[in-house]
């Protein structure tokens, strides 16, 4: 039936016989043989069922693909929202930290101070301060709060404020830190703690009295250029227990000496191979800093540390605070 209407087509591969009948003849055959009509309906129904089943499978698969795409898009949106929330939280923490740090360090006669801080991933946990206590004395403070984020930044702000407030009530560094520890352990409900070193510098005599609450012992460049750690005993961080143990001591800063205080982010900073900077490298670098003012010494130490780090990931804040006796 070239060019005619058809429901199917076939191509013979050999000699065949073809039966041709009109619609009227075909309908007459079906009337005389209804079983043939039933068979044809059965074949067509089976083909329709198979077609419907395949269509259902195709639709089911497309729905599954659409659901997967929707779930992935939803997860990506949630990750983006969480990322934006964390970035905002980190920014708030950094702003709290920067608001605590002094804009300008004092420069009393005979001494100069220097400080540097490099937060890890915009998160603030370290702090430092130098403030006038009156009567020819200066308060010197450096600390490191456990953990990171906004809660730690708030905890840091409270600890800093408590130390400043108690420093007005006592010239004894140990008494100040004990009172602060009492406030923190009784009033704070968090599990955070803070290591700290608080000292009082007598500008007239050069005596530096200090108390160390679990913090890194300072390093001193003496009159002859030798570098050594200050004498130290065991001490505990603020906020751990009400009955705490402090390391208390005092030294005299002779003219030309340089005292450097730092947080453990300095010693723990690692190069691309994972090797920490360590205390000995700080000492070696400090041997070249004897004649420098405090701020220049801090800058040089930071520069040496960054060269050593060489782009490796920074896991903790790095903070320096220095006193130079002119």
Indicate where each model-derived feature is located.
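Cyclic-nucleotide recognition modules
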Residues: 1-42, 49
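Regulatory loop-to-helix N-cap segments in sensory/regulatory domains
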Residues: 2, 19-20, 25-33, 148, ...
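Short beta-strand segments in beta-sandwich/barrel cores
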Residues: 17-18, 216-219, 266-267
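Short amphipathic alpha-helical signal-transduction/dimerization elements
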Residues: 18, 34, 38-52, 160-168, ...
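Amphipathic alpha-helical coiled-coil "transmission" helices that mediate dimerization
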Residues: 39-42, 46-88
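… and, occasionally, acidic/histidine-rich disordered N-termini of signaling adaptors
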Residues: 74-260, 312-326
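C-terminal catalytic subdomain
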Residues: 177, 197, 249-261, 266-326
